[in-house]
From Swiss-Prot:
It comes from Rhizobium leguminosarum bv. viciae. Keywords: Chaperone, Cytoplasm, Nickel insertion. Belongs to the UreF family. Its main location: cytoplasm. One of its GO terms (molecular function) is nickel cation binding. This is Urease accessory protein UreF. It is found in: Cytoplasm. It comes from the Bacteria. UreD, UreF and UreG form a complex that acts as a GTP-hydrolysis-dependent molecular chaperone, activating the urease apoprotein by helping to assemble the nickel containing metallocenter of UreC. The UreE protein probably delivers the nickel. Required for maturation of urease via the functional incorporation of the urease nickel metallocenter. Transmembrane segments: none annotated. Gene3D superfamilies: Urease accessory protein UreF (1.10.4190.10).
Length: 223
């Protein structure tokens, strides 16, 4: 029975963080489009460095910490509301706020195909990592596995954005993804043991790129 539950958890995690899950993540670049326009990301190597920095020290790290906290607090509505409010406050730009809130809303709407009381415990609108953390926690998915899948999905989407922006080809994009595997695993382990005191970032250029994207005249992405 334990193996059956573990397999069920794996299948659900794979479904929820698959590119095919209907949340619209393909529409967002998280400021990468502006970074490319400004010459900060020009090839596969700089794309890998940009993404890796965000995962370890930027917005993706903060999302991982928030996911871990909502995973732990999935049975506590009041605590979930507090963490959800914090996640909104940490959005560093209008587009970043729009991105995380719309992804969270879409994730919850799609995940309701797997009924659970967690949907009643969550606020009506929550940021994406809060939604993923609470739902995976409610379904008994181990936090480290949820975090690894979440971060891998983030990196995959960022690599896809880089390919669409022309800074890497398909083969180079796959090499970037493969090269970041160990980093993803290390950050997932670190985030699983994190607390809210571990929130923080050191990615000023990425934050500025996200802000500058709001006034970019020609663009493919919403952020």
């Amino acid at each position: 029975m334990t193996r059956d539950r573990e397999l069920q958890a794996l299948l659900r995690l794979t479904a929820w963080l698959s590119p095919a899950f209907p949340i619209g993540g393909f529409a967002y670049s998280g400021g990468l489009e502006r970074a490319v326009a400004d010459g900060l990301v020009t090839d596969a190597a700089s794309l890998a460095a940009w993404i890796g920095t965000l995962v370890g020290n930027g917005s993706a790290w903060n999302d991982a910490v928030l996911l871990a906290e909502s995973h732990r607090q999935q049975a506590q509505p009041a605590r979930l509301a507090e963490v959800a409010a914090l996640a909104e406050a940490l959005a560093g730009s209008r587009e970043r706020h729009q991105e995380t809130m719309l992804l969270g809303e879409a994730f919850l709407a799609a995940a309701r195909a797997w009924p659970d009381g967690v949907f009643e415990r969550l606020p009506d609108k929550v940021a994406y990592p809060i939604a993923v953390g609470a739902v995976t926690g409610a379904h008994g998915i181990m936090p480290e596995k949820a975090l690894a899948a979440f971060l891998h999905a983030y990196v995959s989407q960022a690599v896809s954005s880089g390919i669409r922006l022309g800074v890497a080809g398909q083969r180079d994009g796959l090499a970037v993804l493969a090269g970041l595997e160990d980093h993803i695993a290390e950050v997932a382990r670190r985030a699983a043991a994190s607390a809210l005191d571990d929130l923080g970032s050191a990615t000023v250029q990425a934050d500025i790129a996200s802000l500058r994207h709001e006034t970019q005249a020609t663009r493919l992405f919403r952020s």
